[in-house]
Amino acid sequence: MNANAQLSRRQFLSLAGGLATVCGLGLVGCGGSGASAATTAAASTDAATDDSANITQLTVGFDQAYPPYGFVGDDGQFTGFDLDLAAEVCSRNSWDIQLEPIDWDAKDTLLSSGAITCIWNGFTMEGREDDYTFSEPYMLNGQVVVVKKDSGIASLADLAGKAVITQTDSAALEVLQGDKADLAATFASLETIGDYNTAFMQLESGAVDAVACDLSISQYQLAAKPDAYTQLDEALSSEHYAVGFKKGSQQLADKVTETLKAMDADGFVKDLCDKYASYGISYDNWLLK
């Protein structure tokens, strides 16, 4: 794999530590003790009525074109690192599993309606904490930029005047519309598309100059075509993956976290990371140790 395909663990932890500090700062309300008591009472009521872990089936919503976390294998079956994790969690809790490929734009509607139980597919939690109940984060990730090796693009600054593409409603898009909006303003265009497989087809054809994507997606593509692509050394951001549930489903989120920790303790997770190592998955980035 090209050396540019990897960010150092130290760089990730440094970036992630900054994010954790920012995300850990809360806003102190100006209301009196009555408002505080009401909030506490409401939270207690929600906790008392939460029976989300009382399930017999976990319906996992995922993007089927998001390797290595969820994709269609050579045998035509759904596979991927996250789907294997989910299957093992279900097995250990005697739950049936239903894998439900979804339109990523429709994920919130499907979750709120109960059509899916969770979103488990390289799902970034930063910036979404108020919209979902999350498991504890289980994997460190980052947003990066991939270009063609012969493009002459060597830094983020070199993207000025270039056409950049990313997935609709993705973490990369959120970064480029938020913290990195000034950078995006220098692009000739910032395009969005439904899946990353098509984005990389456009990069290969020359229709766009760069793809902004998850580190894991980058590593997967570079492993598949090491002579075609390279990853810029500068990362757009660092982030964490977690399993997203409907708001209020804390018991279920906690149960999944508890099971993932047990899977790490008995070596299952390490073996699974090794299985997907050629796809860019590294046990070094696993967080629930």
Residue spans for each PLM region:
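A ligand-binding cleft/hinge motif common to bilobed small-molecule-binding domains
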Residues: A106-T109, G122-D131, V175-G178, E204-S237
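N-terminal secretory signal peptides
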Residues: M1-Q11, L15-G26, C30
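Ligand-binding clefts/hinges and TM-proximal coupling segments of bilobed small-molecule sensing domains
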Residues: L25, G32, A171-E191, T230-Q231, ...
